[in-house]
From Swiss-Prot:
Belongs to the PsbN family. It comes from Synechococcus sp. (strain CC9605). This is Protein PsbN. Pfam families: PsbN. The gene is psbN. Keywords: Membrane, Thylakoid, Transmembrane, Transmembrane helix. GO terms for biological process: photosynthesis.
């Protein structure tokens, strides 16, 4: 069986990290932790 190139392994690793960070960001923005976020526009009165 052929061995995969190191570049393919690095690319898959980088993609996995990017997808993980994207998923974590979406979870923070829209999941249960989002209840603790403040809206600075609502806090500021003109």
């Amino acid at each position: 069986m052929e061995t995969s190139s190191p570049a393919l392994s690095v690319a898959i690793g980088v993609l996995a990290v990017l997808f993980g960070l994207t998923g974590f960001g979406v979870y923070q923005a829209f999941g249960p932790p989002s209840k603790a976020l403040d809206d600075p526009f609502d806090d500021h009165e003109d």
